[in-house]
UniProtKB/Swiss-Prot annotation:
Residues 54-122 bind DNA. Residues 175-187 have a biased composition (Polar residues). GO terms for biological process: cell differentiation; male sex determination; sex differentiation. This is Sex-determining region Y protein. InterPro entries: HMG_box_dom, HMG_box_dom_sf, SRY, SRY-related_HMG-box_TF-like. Disulfide bonds: none annotated. Belongs to the SRY family. Its main location: nucleus. It comes from the Eukaryota. GO terms for cellular component: cytoplasm; nuclear speck; nucleus. Keywords: Activator, Calmodulin-binding, Cytoplasm, Differentiation, DNA-binding, Nucleus, Repressor, Sexual differentiation, Transcription, Transcription regulation. It comes from Mesoplodon stejnegeri (Stejneger's beaked whale). The lineage of its organism: Eukaryota, Metazoa, Chordata, Craniata, Vertebrata.
Amino acid sequence: MFRIVNGEDYSPAVQQRNIRDFGKAPSLLWTDNGSSNDRCETGGNGRESGQDRVKRPMNAFIVWSRDQRRKVALENPQMRNSEISKRLGYDWKMLTEAEKQPFFEEAQRLRAMHRDKYPGYKYRPRRKAKRPQKSLPADSSVRCSRMHIEETLYPFTYKDGCAKATRSRMESRLSHSQPTNISSSLLPQEHRSSWTSLRHNRVTQAMQTCGRPLLL
């Protein structure tokens, strides 16, 4: 929206009042620096969460490995940090209790200093970030969801259709496997009945093997 500016806005009295009001509200200032914005909005007390986080006191292994890690890194510049950590862990286990004792005492002293400096300190480990799950392609996910919906809404129709299709395929295979030179009309009645029952049994066994419901 636009406001019509009158000539009275530029009078000395109005300008003096604007300057005085502007000086009373310094928190309305905005700068390019993000930390400056926080300080202006919070009255100068804005701090980042990382600065408020208190580190844990060092244990005996950390006290010992500070100088050892630097020494190993200088002697083996091509060694990775993970390999250095494995080597330091192995070397620490190889030390005797007498060799570890000075570092335990130093860690105890640091723990006491930490307790005096932060009396209400409580260790809160950071939560690990969840890894994003691998998503299926769009077309495959749509097909899977569509099949699931169809099977859920029409369970009997879906299963019956599969059973009928499987049965028709089995019957067509059995019909093609018959000898072409023998006609069913020329066979005796008992042979035709035995052949029909045999074909029915084979179809039934095939359907049971496939795990599909059979509709007769």
